[in-house]
Amino acid sequence: MGVEEGAGVDKKITIGVCVMEKKVFSAPMGQIMDRIHAFGEFEIIHFGDKVILEDPVESWPICDCLIAFYSSGYPLEKVQAYSSLRKPFLVNELDPQYLLHDRRKVYEHLEMYGIPVPRYACVNRKVPDEDLDYFVEEEDFVEVKGERFWKPFVEKPVNGDDHSIMIYYPSSAGGGMKELFRKVGNRSSEFHPDVRRVRREGSYIYEEFMPTGGTDVKVYTVGPEYAHAEARKSPVVDGVVMRNPDGKEVRYPVLLTPAEKQMAREVCIAFRQAVCGFDLLRSEGSSYVCDVNGWSFVKNSYKYYDDAACVLRKMFLDAKAPHLSSTIPPILPWKINEPVQSNEGLTRQGSGIIGTFGQSEELRCVIAIVRHGDRTPKQKVKLKVTEEKLLNLMLKYNGGKPRAETKLKTAVQLQDLLDATRMLIPRARSGESDSDAEDLEHADKLRQVKAVLEEGGHFSGIYRKVQLKPLKWVNVPKSDGEGEEERPVEALMVLKYGGVLTHAGRKQAEELGRYFRNNMYPGEGTGLLRLHSTYRHDLKIYSSDEGRVQMSAAAFAKGLLDLEGQLTPILVSLVSKDSSMLDGLDNASSEMEAAKAQLNEIITAGSKMVHDHVSSELPWMTDGAGLPPHADEHLPELVKLAKKVTEQVRLLAQDEHENLAEPSAYDVVPPYDQAKALGKSNIDVGRIAAGLPCGSEGFLLMFARWRKLERDLYNERRERFDITQIPDVYDSCKYDLLHNSHLDLKGLDELFKVAQLLADGVIPNEYGINPQQKLKIGSKIARRLLGKILIDLRNTREEAMSVAELKNSQDQVSVSLYSSRKEDRYSQPKLFVKSDELRRPSTGENKEEDDDKETKYRLDPKYANVMTPERHVRTRLYFTSESHIHSLMNVLRYCNLDESLQGEESLVCQSALDRLCKTKELDYMSYVVLRLFENTEISLDDPKRFRIELTFSRGADLSPLEKKDEEAESLLREHTLPIMGPERLQEVGSCLTLETMEKMIRPFAMPAEDFPPPCTPAGFSGYFSKSAAVLERLVKLWPFHKNTSNGKS
């Protein structure tokens, strides 16, 4: 018989715990049930495995309320029978628990209730390996019933109890697959670089991969009015589980936005599971539910255990004894005998942070703009093709349009081109003769194309692409005989390759990340990791579209955050591409062409123009500053030495060339394999020992590289030098000096010295031959980047000021808000506001507070065992190419020369301007860093409260090799140059205020209103919104109160 609902005052409410013993005796369950029991209003009955599995339901204990949830081996149907018989109040209803075992039904149910989920599609198989006509798999996507999912995408078994989840990566990021699984030791995922094809042995859900900044959020509800959220490092990043000294996985409580709280309420109601855990993805300003787990408790949070016990108590009383008061007693029963903790003895050592932290000045923001690491020389082959096979290939991939060009990037497309080229080369060789120089050159170029396409293990679509552009057409009869149609008979083929991050570049980027971790943030390395792991470090990494830049960013992130494993998952998880901000020179192409033309005049005119109006105090103000005197006299020497090196490489390539000339069936050459975008991760000692070029460049391609440079540098027929080739000659010299010194090329040292002398003058002047021109070109190239930097700085200041205002207002509101400190501590926190308030869309007022759609994670201070939860640092890293570094530096150096800023001092001090003038090159891994500090002892309205510190590094230059000492020998063996340390751009002790920085940069930056509007939902900017309601909520949340005894402050 059921128990009457109107239980007497003296009669205790019975709570049946009908759960497998393994779950009953878990620490969180024990902590919460002990607290419920301590109220004295409840009798708790544990059924036990024997009763649940063996006894008939009629003999099971009778209870008023039932806690019952599925786990492995649990007889859910039997428990349903008991529930029908006794009709207890169910904390989690039983029928919907069947839904949780099928991911398809979970997603359908979420959609039915309007809860956002990732875009997905289901592939259902009745038998393993069943072919389905609606499922298509290609190299970089799968298509389900016409809906296409591009890599990266996620593959989940439909069985909710199968935790083997795969993520497949695009070939542009290196390809491969990461398998996620239940934690084994300290691993939660494993990367398989060679797995490209999806599974076919069962039914799967395919869903869009959501970039979340490498963080997972788990939400725990206790009834529809309470939700607690915790974040952890996503297993997608490197698969290493972060654990505390007790061996528990490290998770930190984070604040939910109002919209997310509403989602938690809806999940709880939709599945009728009062105690329910679910996974939340925060991506690009929106939130999505990607899994619902059912009964789940937070681990290792005593504050949460208190809350959960209080909420469940109210739930039980409302269901079975509504006449009894559910008001929480002023002191919780299990707290009565606890000594009050004092904060007096607390130090600030817990966060492991020293340096400026803890003094009056706090680091608030680090912004770094970084050039990519060491790369192979960039190459280009151009040839006109008339061969039918190549023209047909162009038509195959441009949709059959005779006048449309096509780009070949994917492995399949490049394999097609390689097959065609292999067939054409024997024919080309048979027609060779000394008298037919044009045919000979064409055959050589085809061989070069073939050699590039066959170069294995080093390039992918990011690094190697082919463009086919039709040039001539004829009219031919249509295949059906009716009329004529156009057909191309000649096309221009352009093959671009090279520019790959080398093993040295990867090592440099990782080491620079480590350097930043240990030196840019107070705390000697542990400070940053502590901030990051506790969600007080807001990190975003941006990269241009180029593979070498993306991989530099990923390797840097690996060093910065002390990650492990391959770069592909780190790249996809943590690096955002923004080509409009970090790629391209289109905005300044005409000005740069004009600068190059003037530069050509200056060089060919000799020393006369360079040294007109020279100021000994301001040498950088003259046209063409940095060029050597009588620069034109060095050009013949440059050509002569280039010929000498080219001839040596030709002889080295001869053997390779002869071997290729021997007849062999082209089909025995291994097929083109979609190689990894990572470049080489380690130096190939075997190749070096065998006397071969470093990397995967053979002598044939090395010769092609030098022969092209030699020909382009000087046109013998016209007797004309091309000064735009000087940087490329210097680039090749530098690469071979570092990576191919074992080939002992005679004259390479001398060639490098001449090329460096000229390049040191040419390269900076390509971005403007005088400061005014440099400023104009720089502002055009870096306009969007400068705008984003100003947004970053402004957002940081707004957040810091909001926190400061909260602290200042705390004393005024503490009397009313904390008249009873205990009442606040023991009341139900996190209760939701009305849903109509949460559903309000963002208004225009919020636009200025968040000009980008960056995902945010905020530590929840009330539940965090962290000593300084208000401490928060924003880091923004921008990885780009040489052009953007030069452009940014030029704006910082010369912004005061703009008409609108006449009379203003330069942002860069005189001594730094002098050093920069002598710094000829911003080499690989060169960087500019802006650090924003807040002096918390200065008034909020004083501009000096926020100051900027500017530093730069010239990167990994070759100067250490010039000493020819032991260090130089060691560097040559490793093929890796050290990165020069940062140099200040301001005088020591000077104060560049943020206000001044904004005034000086704003004329050259894209205005905030020109950036795309943020797609941030209501609540994301609300963490630090200045509205009265949010201020009040934050004052309640933030533990700034000196006498609080709630954990650590």
From Swiss-Prot:
Binding of ATP, residues: 103, 156, 163, 182, 207-210, 216-218, 234, 279, 291-293
Residue sites binding substrate per the record: 22-23, 182-183, 218, 232, 296-299
Broad class of enzyme this protein falls into: transferase
Region (Polyphosphoinositide-binding domain): 354-428
Phosphoserine PTM positions: 820
SUPFAM superfamilies: Glutathione synthetase ATP-binding domain-like (SSF56059), Phosphoglycerate mutase-like (SSF53254)
One GO MF term: ATP binding
Entry-annotated residues carrying N-acetylmethionine: 1
EC numbers for this chain: 2.7.4.24
InterPro entries xref list: Acid_Pase_AS, His_Pase_clade-2, His_Pase_VIP1, His_PPase_superfam, VIP1_N
Gene3D superfamilies: 3.40.50.11950, ATP-grasp fold, B domain (3.30.470.20), Phosphoglycerate mutase-like (3.40.50.1240)
Tissue-specific expression: Mostly expressed at low levels in roots and reproductive tissues (e.g. flowers and siliques), and, to a lower extent, in vegetative tissues (e.g. roots, shoots, leaves and stems). Also present in mature pollen.
Gene Ontology biological process: inositol metabolic process; inositol phosphate biosynthetic process; positive regulation of vitamin E biosynthetic process
Region (Disordered): 835-856
CDD domains in the cross-refs: HP_HAP_like (cd07061)
Biased composition (Basic and acidic residues): 835-846
Catalytic activity reported: 1D-myo-inositol hexakisphosphate + ATP = 1-diphospho-1D-myo-inositol 2,3,4,5,6-pentakisphosphate + ADP; 5-diphospho-1D-myo-inositol 1,2,3,4,6-pentakisphosphate + ATP + H(+) = 1,5-bis(diphospho)-1D-myo-inositol 2,3,4,6-tetrakisphosphate + ADP
Subcellular location: Cytoplasm, Cytosol
Record-annotated membrane-spanning stretches: none
Keywords in alphabetical order: Acetylation, ATP-binding, Cytoplasm, Kinase, Nucleotide-binding, Phosphoprotein, Transferase
One GO location term (cellular component): cytosol
PANTHER family registered for this protein in UniProt: DIPHOSPHOINOSITOL PENTAKISPHOSPHATE KINASE, INOSITOL HEXAKISPHOSPHATE AND DIPHOSPHOINOSITOL-PENTAKISPHOSPHATE KINASE
Family, as annotated: Belongs to the histidine acid phosphatase family. VIP1 subfamily.
Function: Bifunctional inositol kinase that acts in concert with the IP6K kinases to synthesize the diphosphate group-containing inositol pyrophosphates diphosphoinositol pentakisphosphate, PP-InsP5, and bis-diphosphoinositol tetrakisphosphate, (PP)2-InsP4. PP-InsP5 and (PP)2-InsP4, also respectively called InsP7 and InsP8, may regulate a variety of cellular processes, including apoptosis, vesicle trafficking, cytoskeletal dynamics, and exocytosis. Phosphorylates inositol hexakisphosphate (InsP6) at position 1 to produce PP-InsP5 which is in turn phosphorylated by IP6Ks to produce (PP)2-InsP4.
Protein name according to UniProt: Inositol hexakisphosphate and diphosphoinositol-pentakisphosphate kinase VIP2
Native organism: Arabidopsis thaliana
The gene coding this protein: VIP2
